[in-house]
């Protein structure tokens, strides 16, 4: 049994046509940091597609690396959902396919430093009949309207990693 891991850097995502997270390149002191900026007051989304090569069974785990643009406290509610299509089998129109029910996680800013890197994981259990080698569309969003999302300012997503079992 092995774990398949798919790294998804910010450039792998397409912002939603309406309320999409902004792609940013922050110069940094020693190196640039690419990120997707999710607003505190507007629900913003990004999308990425991948092939579920060697998917076996079980839930997907989405690990997010993020930091606050300016805040040094508060909570961020992240959400994710997938839509899976089996090529040559499913009759669903690829342009109108619906997403499965979202899964969310609330992650707390650990304080003291505004641009401190944080990590959280979302267990995606609504799998939309996922099968090996499916085309999978992934949506990630910040649920700015959730009562538990209390962090002011942008949350900047620097990396996402999707993992699943091949058995």
For the regions a protein language model found, what residue spans apply to each?
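Cysteine-clustered segments with highest specificity for TGF-beta superfamily mature ligands
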Residues: 118-147
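Extended, low-complexity, turn-rich repeat/linker tracts enriched in Gly/Pro/Ser/Thr and Asp/Glu
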Residues: 54-58, 67-75, 86-89, 146-148
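Extracellular carbohydrate recognition and processing domains
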Residues: 90-128
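Short beta-strands within extracellular/lumenal beta-sheet-rich domains
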Residues: 39-54
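N-terminal leader/pro-regions and domain N-caps
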Residues: 1-41
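Short coil-to-beta strand junction motifs in C2/discoidin
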Residues: 72-80, 153-157
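Proprotein-processing/basic-patch segments
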Residues: 141-167
């Amino acid at each position: 049994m092995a774990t398949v891991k798919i790294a998804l850097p910010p450039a792998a995502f397409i912002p939603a046509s309406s309320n999409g997270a902004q792609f940013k390149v922050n110069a940094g002191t020693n190196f640039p940091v690419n990120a997707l900026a999710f607003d505190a007051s507007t629900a913003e989304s990004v999308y990425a597609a991948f092939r579920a090569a060697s998917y076996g069974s079980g839930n997907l785990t989405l690990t997010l690396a993020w930091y606050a643009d300016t805040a040094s406290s508060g909570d961020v509610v992240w959400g994710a959902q997938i839509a899976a299509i089996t090529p040559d089998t499913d009759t669903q129109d690829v342009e109108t396919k619906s997403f499965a029910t979202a899964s969310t996680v609330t992650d707390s800013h650990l304080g003291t430093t505004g641009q401190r890197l944080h990590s959280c994981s979302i267990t995606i259990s609504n799998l939309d009949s996922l099968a090996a080698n499916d085309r999978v569309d992934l949506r990630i969003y910040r649920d700015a309207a959730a009562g538990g999302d209390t962090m002011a300012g942008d949350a900047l997503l620097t990396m996402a990693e999707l993992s699943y079992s091949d058995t």
